Amino acid sequence: MAEETDEQQAPQSTFSTYMAEGEQLYHKAEYKKASDSFTAALQLQPEEKNCLVARSKCFLKLGEPECALKDAEASLQIENDFFKGLYQKAEALYAMGDFEFALVHYHRGYKLRPEFQGFRLGIQKAQEAIENSVGTPASVKLENKTDLQFISRQEESKKAKQKAQVKVQKKDSKQQKKVDPERSQKTVRQLLGELYSDKEYLESLLRDEALVKGNTRGGVKLHDLIINGILYLDTRSEFWRQQKPIYARQRDRKIMQQKWKRDKNKSADPSQYIVKSLEEIDQLLSSGKAEESYKKAQLVLKKVERWTSVDIHNREELTGSLHSCIGNAQMDMGQIEAALQSHKKDLAIAEKYKLLEAKSRALDNIGRVYARIGKFNEAIKVWEEKIPLANSSLEKTWLYHEIGRCYLELEQTAEAKEYGEKSQQEADAAEDIEWQLNACVLLAQAEVKLKHYQSAISSFENALERARLLHNKDAEQAILVALEDAKQGMEEQQESEQNNDENDNLRADGNTARDEEEEDVHVQRTEEDEG
């Protein structure tokens, strides 16, 4: 008994030992054991901020972003400007699908530690996630005087839609109809796929007032269960497909479906299997099952590689398409380098067999990978190669806008302005208000950096008009702030020019007086010499 007491009283290890053990386990990818070691260390020193961040990283790897967020916030309570805590909080928020709030913290950290590459990459990936997660590009990226701020918002319909999914629809919801257009519902349907019918079923249950008042046998309210189910589907649809807009994925899938349409009635032809497999691969990716999508695409690719061109026509084109699917899945899994190689394989096949549509797709994806990891020069080079292959005004306005953004990141402002103007022209041709808004903002940003304040004010005013047409209150408020900053910049520029003019006049007057004085001295000396 005494021996047991002695064992209980004796400390098992020191704080440093637990920390070292946790770090070793983390590097071995044994995240649960590493978390336990960090927990033991925190029992000895509960307010050790680096240990909190280390455990937060483990929770993130274990798929527990809420716990990761809790530890990150605890480290920030100890030190408000602890950059590791800020980064970890941003990463946790990103994993939870709260991209906009994650973006705020990436920017806070970048302002504190601009040399830390993680913040820069975080800004890039959060920005892209906000732009593409609901399927249509409706982001706004603004900059004010004090700090670079990306104010990216989806349509107002997104927020209205989320509220509508957890509350009973009211008959007089006229305002909601304005901000929840039919195309947004189509986007959600495409993102959820087969799960969309489940979502509709849950929403119908929510309208049954008698049902939602009941409880399960375990005492849990049915209302809460239904709400949680709907919220889960909302969260997943928000997070899925961050890298590529739905319209682009639809295009790729339709291309392949059209190629095989004439053969779909032949039961012995493998084209039926291929079309069905492509749909399943895309559906898995859209459902957030990137790893399953990847495995399915790999399986189909192996089968296709065993076939000959006699077995199946357009074999090479299909092979490239599967490499593209694999690359998209790898991007979602965070395997950036592997994704890049897969898309390059797609490009190589397209170039070898002169498949222009496939080449355009591959260049599109390669550019996205480069932009995501901050290699803006490489992204520009790839996307500029894609320009001749862009067929529609909508595709061109997106392409010019992305190239312009890359130039803006590289501080090559004149080029950013040039592509902003091109994007604006194509957006006008496409009559797409959302892209007109994006192009106007990009153009205004470039003009502010060039100190062309009058032009910037005009561009911001055009952007403001389009934000109001879209009923995008967030973008409207952000543009108003940027507009005031541009006006203030113009006033300061005018004051500076006026002061410079006055100084020039004073210098000119001083030079004249000095010349006259020197002339008088010269005359006086001449008279003295003559005397």
Swiss-Prot record:
PROSITE patterns: TPR, TPR_REGION. GO terms for cellular component: cell projection; cytoplasm; cytoskeleton. It holds the Pfam family TPR_8. TPR repeats lie at residues 15-48, 50-82, 83-116, 275-307, 320-353, 360-393, 397-430, 437-470. The keyword Repeat applies. It comes from the Eukaryota. GO terms for biological process: cilium movement; outer dynein arm assembly. Residues 161-185, 487-531 are annotated as: Disordered. Residues 169-185, 521-531 have a biased composition (Basic and acidic residues). Residues 492-503 have a biased composition (Acidic residues). It is found in: Cytoplasm, Cytoskeleton, Cilium axoneme. Coiled coil: none annotated. The keyword Repeat applies. Keywords: Cell projection, Cytoplasm, Cytoskeleton, Repeat, TPR repeat. Component of the outer dynein arm-docking complex (ODA-DC) that mediates outer dynein arms (ODA) binding onto the doublet microtubule. Plays an essential role for the assembly of ODA-DC and in the docking of ODA in ciliary axoneme. Required for the docking of the outer dynein arm to cilia, hence plays an essential role in cilia motility. Component of the outer dynein arm-docking complex. This is Outer dynein arm-docking complex subunit 4. It comes from Xenopus laevis. The lineage of its organism: Eukaryota, Metazoa, Chordata, Craniata, Vertebrata. The gene is odad4.
